[in-house]
């Protein structure tokens, strides 16, 4: 099938609702997308008990796309999901994790799977990535300074509100469904030249991924948003195409960015919320027992990610400091929040009530 862009997909698909049911952990149908937050311990145990039955089902291999290396938080999360799916399915479902962006950028992967490609079955994406395809609720997860801390985010991810976000793609007729939420830590700016305060960012060329919220945030900080593909970021920093960028701490180190931009300012403008989605085509290949195993593995993986993320990030931060990286703490984030006030208002006013629910979930 011809590859489509986000623009052409939206033009063709419109906003038609699709009430696609998920098979629940016991093999029954549910009218909304099941989530790790709503999957009970009892249901997970039942799915584990079904492993013997699933083991006799036809073997299925699902390709899982991950843009970051396996040693990152999200990479380890993908590896854990693979292990749990294969364990709980009795080996009848095999997850082939393709990491380090070998299958393309996040947008490339989404364009492919939403365009009908059957090469990729599951993708770990930024929680707001589907915003470009009409999922407006997802946009709220990328608004600067929405989540005060990790506990705030996990209050959301484990709440009754999370399924409303995860089910949005299906409600819009997109051929994917959410599996689980996760996070890779707060995102911070890193630069070639030292940065001590927000004022030092003025006039800098900062890499963005052409996301409207990110563009507005960078402009609010007085910098110039510059679109660069993630795979080209290292060389862009090295050659002066951009002066800096932003990433979660673990990704910053794992992608060797300290080699070319050894200054990290801990502004924590957004939490790197992520989710995994599976295509309807892949979901349809699975038997009821296999679907149950996948959802139980998703629930377990969400819990695993929550436990891993903070510990892993603290370890990496200590390593960065020890290696000579110029790490700058930000004690007062008020100037940063004020600089982002415009982009926050512009991107939440149409969903003010829903956004307030997110804010009210702070720990």
Can you describe what each PLM-predicted range is?
Residues 2-4, 13-14, 26-31, 49-151, ...:
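N-terminal secretory/targeting leader peptides
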Residues 1, 19, 31, 35-37:
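Compositionally biased, low-complexity segments enriched in small residues
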């Amino acid at each position: 099938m011809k590859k489509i862009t986000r623009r052409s997909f939206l033009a063709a698909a419109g906003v038609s609702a699709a009430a696609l049911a998920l098979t629940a952990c016991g093999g029954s149908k549910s009218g909304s997308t099941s989530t790790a937050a709503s999957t009970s311990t009892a249901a997970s145990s039942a799915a584990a008990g079904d492993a013997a039955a699933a083991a006799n089902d036809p073997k299925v291999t699902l390709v899982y796309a991950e843009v970051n290396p396996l040693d990152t938080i999200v990479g380890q999360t993908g590896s854990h999901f693979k292990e749990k799916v294969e364990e709980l399915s009795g080996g009848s479902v095999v997850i082939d994790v393709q990491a380090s962006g070998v299958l393309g950028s996040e947008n490339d992967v989404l364009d492919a799977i939403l365009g009908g490609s059957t090469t990729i079955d599951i993708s770990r994406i930024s929680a707001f990535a589907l915003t470009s395809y009409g999922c407006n609720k997802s946009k709220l997860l990328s608004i600067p300074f929405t989540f005060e801390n990790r506990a705030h985010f996990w209050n959301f991810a484990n709440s009754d509100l999370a399924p409303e976000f995860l089910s949005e793609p299906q409600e819009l007729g997109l051929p994917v469904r959410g599996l689980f939420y996760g996070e890779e830590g707060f995102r911070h700016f890193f630069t070639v030249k030292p940065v001590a305060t927000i004022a030092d960012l003025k006039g800098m060329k900062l890499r963005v991924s052409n996301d409207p919220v990110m563009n507005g945030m960078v402009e609010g900080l007085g910098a110039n948003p510059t679109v660069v593909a993630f795979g080209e970021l290292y060389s862009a920093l090295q050659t002066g195409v951009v002066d800096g960028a932003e990433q979660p701490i673990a990704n910053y180190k794992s992608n060797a960015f300290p080699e070319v931009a050894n200054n990290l300012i801990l502004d924590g403008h957004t939490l790197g919320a992520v989710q995994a989605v599976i295509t309807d085509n892949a979901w349809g290949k699975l038997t009821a027992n296999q679907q149950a195993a996948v959802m139980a593995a998703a629930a377990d993986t969400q819990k695993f990610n929550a436990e891993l993320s903070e510990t892993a990030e603290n370890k990496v931060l200590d390593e960065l400091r020890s290696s000579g990286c110029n790490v700058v703490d930000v004690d007062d984030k008020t100037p940063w929040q004020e600089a982002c006030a415009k982009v926050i208002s512009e991107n939440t006013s149409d969903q003010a009530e829903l956004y307030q629910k997110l804010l009210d979930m702070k720990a």
